[in-house]
Every structure is written in structure tokens, then in C-alpha cells.
Amino acid sequence: ITIIDNSFSSIGRAVMWGRSLYQNIQRFLLFQLTVNVAACFIVLIGAFMGTESPLTVTQMLWVNLIMDTFAALALASLPPSAMVMKEKPRSREANIITKPMMWQIFGVGIFFVLLMFGLVQYFKHADVTSLADFSFAEYFKNYFNFKASQGISALEQTYIFTIFVFLQFWNLFNAKAFHSEGSAFKGLFRKDVIAGFGLALFVIVAGQLLIVSFGGEMFNVAAMSAKDWMYIVLGTLPVFIIGEAMRMVKKL
């Protein structure tokens, strides 16, 4: 290590930046692997059931852009935190994917899979033209209904696709808060965070809006009403709320 200003404070800053970068990489892996677990299992279940894939190839391409490009932009741009200096030194043999990360990856990923599987089953056996008509009773009734179905319409496919994207959108906040021991809102409105994390969030929402509105046959989607957008945003919000609640409990 080179002391550039004849002071050991430069070494401290270098360690802080190094630890913060390591945590940002962990956050990115946490988010990316959670999406991978969910997307892979959803597609595999559709294949084993002999039905059309819940997510089309072009839709998966957009999900991959969110997972790789925008998530990397959002999480890699998070500024260093002095809190990392309070942590114990890490062993060279330590795995970058820790046990808490593994639990969160598979726990959240499998939850997303179970939720999306239920939605696919529901839309296969119900003729849905608006999410205002969504019935939890029918959702659970059709969960294990493997009888011949009427298939999934373009609008219902759009619901599945958009719900999946917004599940990842809110989970991106949980990935940001990983290791921070605080709210995902902490430092969210700093200029450097807005320039990276905020921009990525905007691109995800704006991109999804444009795809649903103008994607048509290319993405196998249909335009949704403003109410449907509201239901999806609010319906997927508990992913973030539960994450915030769990972080608050850990602080107690």
C-alpha cells in the first residue's frame, strides 16, 4: 500500500473503499442469483408441465437486462460507507456468497417461484380482463388444478411478465440494504446514489411501461389500464415492506 499523503488515513480510505466494493459485489450477486433461481425454476416448471413458458424469450431478454446491466449500474454505484470499518477482517478463504446470502437467495427465489406458479395456474383457468376481478379464493382453488385449460391470453401473459419484473424491482431495494443494517431509504437521495441507483430504477420502470404499451406481438404483451398498473405496483410492494420489517427486527 502506498501512502500518498504521508498519512495512514489514506490506508484507512483504501480499506474502506475495498470493503465497500466487496459488499457491492455481494449485493449484486444476491440480486442476480435470486432472479436466476426464480426465472430458471419458472421456465423449468412450465416445460415439465408441458405448457407454454410463463415468460417468452423476448421477455426473458428484458429480465436479463434488468438482472445484469441495470442491477450492476444500481448496486455498483453505491458509495462507500464508514460502517464497513467496524466489521472484523475477512478470511482469505471466505466464500463471497455467505450463508445469510444463500438463505435469502433461495428463500426469496422459491417464494417468487411459488407465487408465480400460482398466478400461471390462476390465469390458465380464469378469464381475466382486469386485475380488479382477481380472486384469492380462485387463486388457491386452481393452484393444483392440472386439468386442460383455455390457455393464457396476451393480457394475462402481460400480467405475469409485469408482476415478475416488479417483484425484482422491489427486491432491488432489499439488495441495496443488504449489509447496511438499516433502511433501504438510507442515503437514497444522495446525488451520487440518485445518479446510479435512481437512474437504474427509472430505466426499469420506464422500459417496462414502454414494452407493455408498445411491445405488442414482439413481446407477446397487451396494453394494461392504469388501474392494473396500480394493482401490480401495490401488490408487489410487500416484497419491500417485508424486507424493511425484517431489517427493523434485526436492529432490535
State where each predicted segment sits.
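Hydrophobic membrane-spanning alpha-helices of multi-pass integral membrane proteins
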Residues: 103-116, 163-167, 194-212, 235-237
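Membrane-interface capping segments at transmembrane-helix boundaries
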Residues: 126, 177, 245-252
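C-terminal membrane-solvent junction of multi-pass transporters and transport-like membrane proteins
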Residues: 97, 101, 181-203
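Aromatic-capped, Gly/Pro-kinked transmembrane alpha-helices
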Residues: 144-151, 186-187, 213-227
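Alpha-helical transmembrane segments
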Residues: 168-172, 240-247
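Transmembrane helix-loop junctions at the membrane interface of multipass transporters and ion channels
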Residues: 44-53, 121, 208-225
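Membrane-embedded transport module
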Residues: 1-182
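Small-residue-rich transmembrane alpha-helices that serve as helix-helix interface/gating elements
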Residues: 225-239
